[in-house]
Regions:
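Beta-sheet-rich non-transmembrane sensory/scaffold domains
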Residues: 1-275
Length: 275
């Protein structure tokens, strides 16, 4: 927070310590007045790619709800010193699953499930903030990062309704790989280079995760609780007509398109996709 008249720093908060995952704040912070325990608080909310929402008193910089520093996995890369902890807001709860969990993987059929597990086994997996790892020949191909660098929440930000204190947050559900490569020593003395960021693809061209692949969550910011969550639109035509999914009893209309699309959220909780 800066004083716009003088440029003076008023307060600040570091959302990710020693960032190794491209988890920079993806969108502009959102201003809004909410009522917490009967007291009006002028807030500023920052959504993150990690699928979290940091809410501060925009005058003082104090968190509206406690933010806990939790231990996180440490880097095993020689010379790297990752942060021992990362901040986790107590409220609102995370918008998406964080880190690696087998139950999140695609499970339309036993065969697709087995292939998804085999793909996941190619990566170093663990809780969110597991550090990037080198690509090993015949071994793991980097670290499973979930939510991926494109969210969680991302550039699209969110919408705040000042009449009722509701925040509507569009989200994407897709992991990515954080991989390190050993460079040519004739060209650099660096130990490792960051590999290009890629989505972790699922079996047979399908997403690696169970749907919904995009969704919107409505959060009552007065109490820091999610009220409802809905998928954003149907699955893509490619998924709907995928040969391995024909004849299965699947709800294609509520899987959420792999790419977030424009939508309108109505008071009755219905979602209308407009593009």
């Amino acid at each position: 927070c800066l004083d716009g008249r003088t440029g003076e720093l008023i307060w600040f908060y570091q959302l990710t310590h020693h960032g190794l995952w491209d988890y920079d704040p993806p969108s502009a912070p959102i201003l809004g007045d909410i009522a917490v325990n009967g007291r009006v608080v002028k807030t500023v909310t920052q959504l993150t790619k990690q699928g979290m929402s940091f809410v501060f008193d925009r005058i003082t910089g104090e968190p509206v709800w406690p933010i806990e520093e939790r231990p996180v996995p440490q880097s095993e890369v020689p010379g790297e010193q990752s942060s021992p902890t990362q901040p986790f807001p107590s409220l609102p709860p995370p918008y998406l699953s964080q880190g690696y969990h087998e139950e999140d993987l695609l499970d339309f059929t036993p065969e697709l499930r087995a292939e998804a597990l085999a793909i996941a086994a190619q990566y170093v997996t663990g809780p969110m903030y597991t550090p990037p790892t080198p690509v090993r020949e015949g071994g793991t191909q980097g670290t499973w990062v979930n939510p991926g660098y494109q969210g969680g929440a991302n550039w699209n930000g969110a919408a705040f309704d000042p009449q009722n204190g509701m925040m509507f947050v569009p989200l994407r559900n897709a992991p990515m790989a954080a991989s390190l490569l050993e460079p040519d020593p004739a060209r650099t003395d660096w130990n490792y280079l960051r590999a290009p960021s890629v989505f972790i693809q699922g079996p047979r061209g399908l997403p690696i995760m169970r749907p919904p692949w995009s969704l919107v969550t409505a959060t009552d910011m007065n109490i820091g609780q999610h009220i409802w969550s809905r998928s954003i639109g149907p699955a893509s035509d490619y998924i709907r007509h995928h040969p391995d999914l024909q004849g299965l009893d699947l709800d294609f209309d509520n899987m959420g398109h792999p790419m977030i699309r424009p939508f309108t959220a109505a008071a009755d909780f219905t979602i209308t996709v407009s593009g």
